[in-house]
Amino acid sequence: MALPSLLLVVAALAGGVRPPGARNLTLAVVLPEHNLSYAWAWPRVGPAVALAMEALGRALPVDLRFVSSELDGACSEYLAPLRAVDLKLYHDPDLLLGPGCVYPAASVARFASHWRLPLLTAGAVASGFSAKSEHYRTLVRTGPSAPKLGEFVVMLHGHFNWTARAALLYLDARTDDRPHYFTIEGVFEALQGSNLSVQHQVYAREPGGPEQATHFIRANGRIVYICGPLEMLHEILLQAQRENLTNGDYVFFYLDVFGESLRAGPTRSMGRPWQDNRTREQAQALREAFQTVLVITYREPPNPEYQEFQNRLLIRAREDFGVELAPSLMNLIAGCFYDGILLYAEVLNETIQEGGTREDGLRIVEKMQGRRYRGVTGLVVMDKNNDRETDFVLWAMGDLVSGDFQPAAHYSGAEKQIWWTGRPIPWVKGVPPLDNPPCAFDMDDPSCDKTPLSTLAIVALGTGITFIMFGVSSFLIFRKLMLEKELASMLWRIRWEELQFGNSERCHKGAGSRLTLSLRGSSYGSLMTAHGKYQIFANTGHFKGNVVAIKHVNKKRIELTRQVLFELKHMRDVQFNHLTRFIGACIDPPNICIVTEYCPRGSLQDILENDSINLDWMFRYSLINDLVKGMAFLHNSIIASHGSLKSSNCVVDSRFVLKITDYGLASFRSTAEPDDSHALYAKKLWTAPELLSGNPLPTTGMQKADVYSFGIILQEIALRSGPFYLEGLDLSPKEIVQKVRNGQRPYFRPSIDRTQLNEELVLLMERCWAQDPAERPDFGQIKGFIRRFNKEGGTSILDNLLLRMEQYANNLEKLVEERTQAYLEEKRKAEALLYQILPHSVAEQLKRGETVQAEAFDSVTIYFSDIVGFTALSAESTPMQVVTLLNDLYTCFDAIIDNFDVYKVETIGDAYMVVSGLPGRNGQRHAPEIARMALALLDAVSSFRIRHRPHDQLRLRIGVHTGPVCAGVVGLKMPRYCLFGDTVNTASRMESNGQALKIHVSSTTKDALDELGCFQLELRGDVEMKGKGKMRTYWLLGERKGPAGLL
């Protein structure tokens, strides 16, 4: 067969200009040119390489050029190193792609290791390449390999408890690349490494070969692995049928990694490897014999990217190579080459960014170890040996009527986990065969002695059996009587009068206590409002001194049938740390309710929707672990399934342990909401598609539906964005439920941010909400899966609890600090508002709860002012203009009086009243403080601008008087600090008898100002005052220039 050496040269350009000193990136491909029986033949892989180059061209500013140099050769370990040397000497490639054949790959890999040149292949499956010694240190296998098949087989043996023996049969002509030998080699080494007795034999393609094979099987093992052509398997099975080796004592694993036996052929239909061009009797014998056969194949990637890639691959193969390829598992190898090229480009780019060079092949290869990324073939995980983790499928005759083979299990190499589809394997005897049954291989065991028993031994044996049967029968009868007694006693029953509530409305079913997480916790149920918001309620009460949760049942009465009694008994029997304890039930109409353990921390839904609670991933994994443990126990209990699992049915107790509630008691369940209500559809967001269709399901189906609900809860915990979060879509619960129920491809599922979440967690979510229930894992598998990627899961229960409590305490401290700061800020605002209404000293007295007594002041100075012509101005202005005018004026005044030792008493309309000398006495400074303030206000008015009448001058009239007053707080609602006395009236008369833009002062004020000798006053004369007679008054003109004043 031809072995072309193809060179793909990629010239990297940055913005169309090559950097100085840069050179082309050379990729040398060494693969068979014409033999399509190889999955790595160039016509199969070439289109994938071209697609990879195009993908790199779209992602990077590169100029792609293909240069080929074809040399004739064979898939030979002798010619391959010669070709490798030629490529190195004449082209100096940066990466070798291939070979896929084992022997050529071994030779070329040794040279590549010496040159420190990366060698990337999706073939070379042999186990010897896994030991990355000095010979193969630059080899990277991005495709399947035999050791990974061995890992899968070892896990199968562990699952079926096969720990002793196995037999291997394979074809090895030694004239080709020995594909069957290298495939089964991985199984042999893995089983031998697990301390099993493993025997192997080459199948002889000659007369008597089938008889030799069955003789080898009888002598060496009940678990048989066969690797060879389908015709070889048919021959062995026909002979096994003749010798009665297909009676269920043996199982035959057929290693058909590319699934050729399951494809349709000239003489067989798809999925029926037993069909062949034989006689009717032989065909029937083969069909019966194949019931004992399990087929192992690679797993075709289920992601839509691979399907699209395969379609493009077939088109390019036809257009570029003139080859018609069919969809098959062989195309997986092309996809692995595609992902390998993109992996190399990604690592090379990182290496250069870190200061490395493309010539540093060892560094590039080391950076590929342990890498995880998503390619067209799904999740690509490289192990520490730079071998890709491989997925496999186990096929069994799932339909005994048609004889069709169907997937029984999927193996994930990345997770080291087997996912059983739920389709039972049709074991002939109903159970898997034993790998080392007694007296089958070890005849030296004394128990295998078949010497007949004596008459006395037979009598003794019969008597013993009779006594045993009598004892068992007595025990069963006693157990039956005790069961009936327990059912009749109704230990679960609670009288309504035994329940105590916090209020007297015992019969009021709507009396729920609204709870908050930071105080007492909240409910187990959620109600959706018309606006889509959740309101959480819990009905709680006391039973025998303990707080309990009470769930009312929307039924008029409960018939105590035998089924209902058994349901209640089972609820009492089921006790587990992660299930809420069932206390009892009240069936007294109309107060029918279920009483369970109360968990004060609230529901999981409450916690996730409370943004003030910080949940790190340790805490989240703890909650997930608790949920998985509870569901695993529930599924293995007599209750078997939940049926309504959702985050509101998961509650957290005082020790931060998550518990599952609202399980069991199917006879008590009823739907209170209308069929088309918003709340009803909101509760169905966690419901599996098969339940939404309304078809009744068996118990196993309900368990798979619980797994779907768990997947939705996982998404809630991961994103904390509510159930069934959809990025960029605003759909009602009804629309979401309808889309899920329709089941159209692509299946409608919540949004996932893969960049922010653990890839394994995302994979678990997707498997949990798979459309086909058989593809969903059970909770036992989920428990093992989470244990592997939860790094904190190994801590003790006490450590975990302490960590949870510490985190919760930190959250509470942070919450208290935030609330305290908010309280202090609001207190400051309230006090500031109070100080604006009342004097500071008076406000402090009121804050201390003291009574403010009226106080007399011997001498204070009072200021009054108003606007001349304000009535006429108001009549010519709108109310809003008047308000704006007064607001602007008094804002200006308030800013000015802050500079003086004065207290603003009040404003009424255009009147403005200020006093100095109270409530804090200031000696004789009250008169000059008011005088200076009045001068400042008069000066400000001269430049004040009226918005709606900018050309008008505002004319202020001011009156000032000094004398004794009495002051105190008046009223309870809107209390005011008021002044009383003749001095107030006199000051008002001084203002009303004054003149515009002048300050009118009394003689007492003039005398107080004269003591300072710095104020300029002018005698006005005697003025007639209403109620006062004639009073001598003065005009305050200003303050003389001096050290402390201005004129």
Curated annotation (Swiss-Prot):
Disulfide bonds join C75-C101. It is found in: Cell membrane. It comes from the Eukaryota. It catalyses: GTP = 3',5'-cyclic GMP + diphosphate. Residues 513-786 form the Protein kinase domain. Its EC number is 4.6.1.2. Residues 861-991 form the Guanylate cyclase domain. Belongs to the adenylyl cyclase class-4/guanylyl cyclase family. This is Atrial natriuretic peptide receptor 2. The gene is NPR2.
